[in-house]
Every structure is written in structure tokens, then in C-alpha cells.
Amino acid sequence: MRHLGLLRRRKVAVAAVFVLGAGLLAGGGVVATNALGQPSVDARVNALLAKMTTDEKLEQMQLLADWQATPAEAQKGIGGVFSQTDPATINALQHEAVEHSRLHIPILFAFDTIHGFRTVFPIPLGEASSFDPSVAQTDATIGARETAATGIKQVYSPMVDLSHEPRWGRIAEGSGEDPYLGSVMAAARVHGDQGSDYSAADKVVASVKHFAAYGAPEGGREYNTTDMSTERLFNMYLPPYKAAIDAGAATAMCSFNAINGVPGCANQETETNILKQDWGFDGFIESDYTAVAELRTCPPVNPDNGPCGHGIAADGPDAAAAAINGGTDMEMVSTNYVDFGKQLLAEHKITMPQINDAVRRILRVKFRAGLFEHPYVDPSQAAAAQLLPDAVAAERSAASKSMVLLKNDNSTLPLDPNKSVAVIGPLGDDQHDMLGPWWGTGQDQDAVSLYSGIKAQDPNTTFTKACDLPNTEPPDYNPANDCPNTSFPDAVAAAKSADQVVLALGETREMSGEATSRSNLDLPGNQQELINEIAATGKPFTVVLFNGRPLTLTNVAAKSPAILEAWFPGVQAGNATADVLFGKVNPGGKLPVSFPVNVGQVPIFYNHEPTGRPCDVGVKWDSRYRDLTTCDPFYSFGYGLSYTTFNVSNLQLSSATMSPNGSVTATADVTNTGSRTGDEVVQLYIHDPTASIEQPVRRLRAFERVTLAPGQTKTVSFKLTSNDVGFYDNFGKFIVEPGQIDVYVGDSSKATMTKSFTAQ
């Protein structure tokens, strides 16, 4: 599975660390230096590595959770600690490592800053809806600043797992179903996290995850097996990871899932051959939580009650050997490396060059991060760096940019601020759930509820909860307790008393994220019944959805005149949503993932491959569902409405042919034909109609979000090269085949305006 082309290796410049740690190069010898005559990072790494005992090397390969990290462990020289967020404790543990371990190697502290640290931004799936990489980069920039101020120098982000599975809860953490959009957003997050030099005081080390194809679990069930072809892996799932690596991501996290029978954290093909060798990645790979231990076979009676299950290792030593041989450099939580590493060396099941390579990678990142020069943080400044006004303002803008208007019949929106509003629903005055899954250190009180945001813009606003969505977890969770209908009469009365109604519906944050797979994608509980009863009042109403995945909205749309997809918007949820509802912000987001008509269509995605019998619901022997009148999703990838209207026209190609090293530029005009200033996302797709292996019916290759005043026209330009029209074959080789390439430009994946050129 070697490959070139779109996923080809690219060297990333990393700023040298200029201050030499005391005594690290003692012992003489010629040392490589940089242009200023100072020791290079690799020279410092090699000098330090030469002093280390086997035990010290294995300790560097150990990553502990906050609850495991003690002063004694720090003195042993552990490599990393995650989820500790108290700066005083971080300093204390760092002091033990730097002052009281033999070689004074600092600890790399890490945290899951997925969409914000204290200033929680929209979930990444929501930010992908902005089709604006600056939104993701700003989120990461502010998250890095707040995280680093606490003494944490690594973030387990970006999460770039492409997914076609709305049943899978972690779809909330990625950028949806498209490899190109996912790649653009992945690179933007890395740039925000690391900047040009991640040793800077306000920057952190990015860790791209979960490598690889974690977003394709069978049945959409968390942690489940992934099975896919080579061409699907290379064309669809790997590009966002590669984009993050090309952007400079210094570390990576391997995945829980098995890929074609080999677990991600013991997978030599993905970890060593692809990531390290083919892509030239010189950082380190950490395992996910107990993923090394989970390689073990579960015994009939599990006396230590430890993690196990994959069954490719008989015991702890076997698991450690499998992970090290696969390419996992650092073990999270479980301790098989430090417990059995020396035994495995003696038994020749692993080698010292493998250990040295892993430790060299870990030390390289620590030196580049400036930890040897600046291991400590000022606790008095940590709190002052959180929730700053510029961060809150940026979050409000990001949240409104990430919202998608799905329906707006009869100009139900924008709301009239001079008329009364009834906010109704279980999420209407909610703060907790607005932060979404992986809320960092965000606090419920940080968040602005929808009711508060609307009332700030229209004082004549009331709130009626109507029902509860309990934040309970299995085994205590019972779907029958979701949104009971006993208080619906109060909601109906409130609706009848108001001029306009806003229904705040969706999921709790506990229903989304890790370990939250759902078999049903309808609104939980009796929320649809609530919609039906409000619809029966005849009052104009809008459904605002707070959720972390695509939902089945067929019945919702049948009853609702307006639907706004707000996702989990973050700390400024209420204010940002009110900005959109009242028209202060014209919604311009587009869906980064398809919304199915029915859960039985899943997985459904726009860039699917064709069949010999394309769907025709009127023909029995075509690829269709007997009980559906369409093969399309309910809402397609790239879809989204506005309070104004746009027209995309005049598609032109600069050439009728593309030479092997040449390019073709596509231009199109986009005009605001309505009465309000607004944003349109112009999208370019291609199709290769005749190829040696089937090609997707559409592939997104470019997009641009533009702001236009009424009547204004702008010409957008997209440059296509062979990298855009080629593909990976069944052997993982990137090829560009001569022949026709169809270009489509429009406002969604259903674009119809088309021209063609010939690739030579």
C-alpha cells in the first residue's frame, strides 16, 4: 500500500529551539548545529538519548492519566500526562520531573481541546458547516492560547475522522463526510494550534486523530470494526490525516478500531509504512486510552478486570510487542511498555533500535516545543487567559457562521423583534447542553441559553420547557423518559399567547460524542409530538435544532415552516442563534454531511460510487428502496438556505485540456438576487465518467464562501491540477488517467451547471 500523488510527502519547516538545556551535551564530541551555531534539535535528542538507560527510555514511552500521575511517577521520568488542568498541580509534577529525575526531562502535558478549552466553540461538525477554514483556525488559536496558559503543551486535536455514519456519536467531532472539506478544516486547525512555531508561549503541539478510519465502524457502533478496500481508504479516509501532517501536526493518536482485522494501535501498515515512512512523519504516535491493553484476548474469567478484547495478543507482553512493532511510540494509561519492555528486549520480540526510534520521536517533540527551556507556567496568569472578550466575540461569530437554514417557508424567519416570542422546548433555557460533547473546561454558567439570547433582543419573550431531556447515561438511561408529554398543554397555551414561536429541540450533549451511538435518528422522545401540537395552533414557528449528528427530519419538516440547524453552538449559543433568528446575521452555512430520509439509508453520502443499475424509484430492478420514493438524502451535502437568494452562472473553463503538469481554471459568477446582504458558498465538483475503477458520482474539489450585497456580483475562480482529478487505485497508487473530466459548479452537491475538459 505505497502511494504518491495527493498524499505525497511534504517537508514541514519547524523552528529550531535555540536554548541549550544544562548539561545535555556534556561529554564532548562534534555536535550538529544550526545556522546560528547552536546545537540542532536532533543533535540534542541524540546526546540525551545516549545517556538514557533502558528503564528511562521506557518511562518516556509512558503516558498517564491525571489520576495516575504522582510525584513518584514524575521522578521516574514519565513521558506524558493528560487531563490534568490545574496549573499548580502541573507545575508541581513538572518540578518533580525536571528537578528530581536523573536526566531532568520535562513532562508533556496534554488535553482534549477539541473545540475550545474554556471558551467552548461550536462542535467541529458545526464549524465545518461554515465552509470557512478561518472559523476552525480561530477556534484552534484561542483554544491553544487558553490551553497553553494552563501549562498544557499538547492537544488531542484535530479529530479528522471522516464519517458516513450519523449513528456514530463521534461524527460530532469531525468535519463530516467529505475528504476535501475535511482536509481543509484539518489543516486550518493545525495552523491554529501550532502556528509557525509551537514553542511559542501561546501555541501547543497538535495530535491528529484517530489514525486511521475510526469514523467507519460497522453499524455505526462505537469502537467497532472497520473493514474497507485499499482504494476507499486512500481516496476517502486518509486525505484529512495527510492534510494535518502536511500542515505540520507534530504528533498523532492511533485508533481503537481494527482496520481489516488489525487494530489501529498495532497496525504496521498504517502507523509505520504509511504515516512514518511514506508521509515522512517524524513526530510520535500515542495510543488511545488503554488501546494497547485492549489488544489482549479476554480470558473466560478476567481476574484483573482490565481492558481486553481484540484478541491479537495473548497477554500484556504480547500486547506491548504488537503495539511497538506496529509503530505506537507511547502507551496511554495501561503500562505494558514499562512493565514488559525489558523482558521483550531480552526475548528479542522487540529491538533497541525500535525503542530508540520511539524515544527519539518523543524527545524531538519536547525539544521543539521548548519544554526544556520553559517547563513551568505562571498559575496566576492561567485564569486571566480564559474567556477573554476577544475569544467570546470570536465564538459568537463562529457559532452564527456555522448555522444552516434548512427550511424557511413563507418567510417565517427572520423573527420580528417588535412581536412577542414564545420559546418552547427542553433545550430552550439550557446552558449545559449548548457546549456539546468534549466541552474542555467549559462551565455551564459560561453558556448563554437560547431564551436569554432571544430575550436580550426581544424583551417580550416567554419560556416554557414543555418536557425534560434527562442527562443520564446507560445503564440508567431509558429512552422512555425523553421528553414526556405531560406538560405539553402548557406549551400549547404559551404558543397561542405569542405572535411567534421558537421550538428548541434536539439532543443533550450526553447523547452525542464518544460512546453515544444511536440506532434511531429521530428526535428523542416525544419531541415530534410537541411539534405536531404547536403546528396545530396555527402560529408561525421555527424549530431550532441543537444536536451533534444528522437527524431524520422528514416528519419535522412536514409540520414545521422553518428549521434552523444550530448544532451545539458553544458558549455564545443563545446570542449567536438569536442573531440569526432576528436577521442580524444572515445564515450562510451549508451541510457538511447528508441528512437521511430514514435511518435505513445509512450510510448515505453524496460522493458514492455508481452502480450498473442507478436508482430509479419507478423501476423494480434498479438500486432503490422498496419503501421509499427517493434514493436521495432528505437534505444533501452542501445544502443550505439564506434570507436572500443567489444565482450562480456563467461557468467558464480556461482550457479544454489539462496537460500532465498543467492546470485548468474554472470561473463562475455569483449574484445576490435578493434584498439582503448574505453569504453564498460556491462549490465546485468533478466527475470522471470513464476510469479504470469506478469514480464517485461527484467529488468536491474547491469552494469559496463570499459575502454579497443585494444586486452585487462576484466572479469566483478555482484552479484544478492533476492532483485534483487523479485517484488511488486498488493498490494504493495515485494515478491520473487521460480522459474527460466533468466540472459542476453551484450551491450544493446537486449543482447542475457543467462543462468538461480533457485530462491528458
Describe the function of each predicted region.
Residues H3-L4, R8, L25-G726, I735-S749, ...:
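Glycoside hydrolase catalytic-domain context in secreted enzymes
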Residues T754-K755:
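C-terminal effector modules
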